[in-house]
Amino acid sequence: MKKTVCELFAGVGGFRCGLNNIRTAEDYGKKEKWDTVWFSQWEPAEKSTQYAHDCYVYRFGTRLDNNGEDTTNYNIEDVDKTTLPDFNLLVGGFPCQDYSVASSLATSKGLEGKKGILWWSIRETLEAKKPPFVLLENVDRLLKSPAKQRGRDFGVILACFRDEGYTVEWRVINAAEYGYQQRRRRTFIFAYKNNTKYAERILNTIGYTDTLEEEHTKECMENAVLKEGFFAETFPVNKAESAKMKIKELPVEVGEVSETFQCAFENSGIMKDGTIYTMKTVPNYHGKQITLGDVMETG
């Protein structure tokens, strides 16, 4: 599989730097393992204030769509997703103003908010390009938004992935709990098409079939969360004390999810074929702890 990626809501290129292990200014310009075939970065302001896009282009250059046009600094809602080059991985830290600590949970509008609706641009991209893999990032509050209907917004996201034929893993990760010098809790979402070899390997590894009894299915999904899933090796966890795997079904229609669905999502979980498996986990990290003093310049 070619390592081709599309980066939405790109900022100054955080996902691109991570995928290609770009750590210093000297790393820019080196051959990248992942070929970024297209990206999008746009702020709803005057053209002269597109600082993040300007920085991205300064470091990495721009990309053209299949019509030979540069639409990387257009409102993503106005971009025809069918014109994007093909890619195998879609990444993005989609706008999260409505979920973040910048506003209280009680007043959060979630997917109904001005920027929250940009989730639908991600869904349009999934429909148009059908990438086999997706990696997204948002604030941890996403799992509980909005206050009046806890879990609705994340339920809508999962239902959209289900309808496009994806299995989804998620994990709330705090960088400080894995040795880094910043307390930063974020929800990471990894989705993969059900017809990929990766999906087949995961199911075979955890021993899952669609004919298993519920208790055996829960054991398989717990194995995926704790040992065999996408996040398990890099960000190891243990089951929290007295934690149990909870199961909940998504309504068939996305509209019904939006109107009635509620779920007490835990910090780890999997959704497969519309069934949600979620459990509370705790970090299992015993390595070096980097402090702020280790990275600050002195003198």
Residue ranges and their predicted role:
Residues 1-133, 139-155, 159-162:
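Core alpha/beta nucleotide-donor-binding catalytic domains of modification enzymes
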Residues 1-36, 160, 186-299:
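S-adenosyl-L-methionine-dependent DNA methyltransferase catalytic core
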